[in-house]
Amino acid sequence: PLFSPIVNIDGTPYLDGGLADSVPIERALEIGNEKIVVILTRNPGYRKKMPSKGVMKIYRSSYKTYPNLLRTIARRSIVYNRTMEKIEKLEEEGKIFVLRPQMKTVSRLERNADTLTDFYNHGYNYMKKQYHNLLEYLQKEE
């Protein structure tokens, strides 16, 4: 959130909705989606850590007029980790199809072209391997 500005639309401030719900699987189920494909950017087993006191201090300073945003940021890792548990359970049950890197992901700030190319190629090749499984999932009758 610190790197993306708050945008006001008709007087209402907005930030990336991923802060509140990084992977809206519950919403997809609520509205009745039957074939759900989830594309994650983190490797299996990844869990978010709680923000440190120092980081929370920076957030409090930057967003002191947005107490709900601060609460959302403070509990983001808890919500994210519960969502990942739900996704893993649904994937295991065959109710959703999940694509995710099978290797540790690169940093959002990564600039090394070789590292980025390797990660891109990993994703491309992994999808080629999973393509048949994805089609099978999408064609499967419930």
Which residues are covered by each model-predicted region?
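Patatin-like phospholipase
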Residues: 1-142
